[in-house]
């Protein structure tokens, strides 16, 4: 099962508090493991403009302002921009299932600071990673639901409402979710 481009929706049974009510877009998945970005946990004390300032990247008056998220517990000092596929940095952008791009180089930050770049984007500090078979085991254990990732929800500014919104998009009332998995 290749979950690249899928959205993981944390179930109430999620044992790891870092992923409680999280949505994770899986950017890469293979027999060697998986890598994804949490898309609904903003970093409250860091703005995109503040990050550009720290990196000495000048921001034009029409420069873009995108939300900065905590992408996961791995390498929190490393930044990733998840974006619409209308922007490609040669040799640096990874296309995710044809629906998203992920770029981790300074050129996309400079483009956004100039008011250019992709039409939709969010910044993630760090990432979520799984070793071989680990994600599959978590899905089987009922830690995560998986679904196709709607672009409009991924790039929505309503971070607190994304988890509930995704469940409702799937036809699931969040109040009916159980924290225990059944076995048929």
UniProtKB/Swiss-Prot annotation:
Protein name: UPF0301 protein Rsph17029_2659
A GO CC annotation given for this chain: cytosol
NCBIfam families on file: PRK00228.1-4
Family: Belongs to the UPF0301 (AlgH) family.
Coiled-coil segments: none
Species this chain originates from: Cereibacter sphaeroides (strain ATCC 17029 / ATH 2.4.9) (Rhodobacter sphaeroides)
Gene3D superfamilies in alphabetical order: VC0467-like
């Amino acid at each position: 099962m290749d979950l690249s481009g899928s959205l993981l929706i944390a179930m109430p049974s999620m044992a790891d508090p870092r992923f409680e009510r999280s949505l994770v877009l899986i950017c890469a998945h293979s027999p060697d493991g998986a890598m994804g970005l949490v898309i609904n946990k903003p970093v409250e004390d860091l703005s995109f403009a503040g990050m550009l300032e720290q990196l000495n990247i000048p921001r034009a008056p029409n420069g873009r302002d995108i939300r900065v998220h905590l992408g996961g517990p791995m390498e929190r000092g490393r930044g990733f921009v998840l974006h619409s596929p209308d922007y490609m940095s040669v040799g640096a952008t990874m296309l995710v299932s044809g629906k998203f791009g992920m770029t981790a180089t300074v050129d996309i930050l400079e483009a956004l600071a100039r008011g250019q770049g992709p039409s939709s984007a969010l910044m993630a500090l760090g990432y979520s990673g799984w070793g071989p078979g680990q994600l599959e085991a978590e899905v089987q254990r009922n830690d995560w639901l998986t679904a196709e990732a709607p672009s409009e929800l991924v790039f929505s500014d309503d971070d607190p409402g994304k988890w509930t919104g995704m469940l409702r998009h799937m036809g699931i009332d969040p109040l009916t979710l159980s924290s225990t998995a059944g076995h048929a």
